[in-house]
Amino acid sequence: MNRDNTKTNKTVKQEFASFTFVICIALVIRILIMEPFTVPTGSMKATILENDYIFSTKYSYGYSNYSLSFFDFIPLFKGRVFAREPERGDIVVFRPPNDMSVRYIKRLIGLPGDKIQLIDDVIYINDKKIERTEVGTYIGEDGIKYLKFKETLPNGRTYFSYKLAPIFGIISNDRYSNTGVFYVPEGQYFFLGDNRDRSNDSRVNLGFVPFENFIGKAQFIWFSTKITWWDNDIGIINLILKLKPWIESVRLSRIFKNLYNVDE
């Protein structure tokens, strides 16, 4: 009997040790290597849609206090360690300096020391306009029509941006299309959303983003749905009823999509 109890206790200890090891490995991966994020807004549409689930690499820019999951509100250190310089066109997850409780995802356009301006929707970097060509239209899932543009930055990075199509000849959001001049300070960066008319970015409330606030570089979409399923405000019965339409809303074509693929 005692022998059986000893064997049982040993098995429980082994299983607990294995479970603890797996949890530790998962935490190390999330803190230092790769972290999943859910995108709740359409500011990067149509590169990234609402309810896209993305993976970002934590090591791409080194590590700062804000990039360490679960420890980001503890002042462990200042600056970045193992820092690597970001590049124009990177899609970056970061904490906005005006609200450190949330995470933003935007495209990096301006580097420290740059002069940035938008004139008639065209980006000018250090008084030189980037290449920008209209390549078609995009109709969102909400039925809203966008003009689709292919843009190429000075480093050769190419991507698509989107602008609301004119309605009855009226062009929307002129304050987004024509801006003042922005001089990017040292150690800070200028960001834009690919959805140019519907993005809270460096043109308006966001301002410049310190390098220290970078969390990681967005790499690919690993899952995507048209609607959300989990909601803390609804009961278990409603969650069960919502499960089927949630499964049916999965965007299969977006699963494992590379965010830097411009062949589409």
Curated annotation (Swiss-Prot):
Q: Which Pfam families match?
A: Peptidase_S26 (PF10502)
**What protein name is recorded for this chain?**
Signal peptidase I
What role does it play? Complements E.coli mutants temperature-sensitive for LepB function.
Q: Which GO terms describe its biological process?
A: signal peptide processing
- Which superkingdom heads the taxonomic lineage of this protein's source? Bacteria
Task: Output the PROSITE patterns linked to this UniProt entry.
Answer: SPASE_I_2, SPASE_I_3
Q: Where in the cell is it found?
A: Cell inner membrane
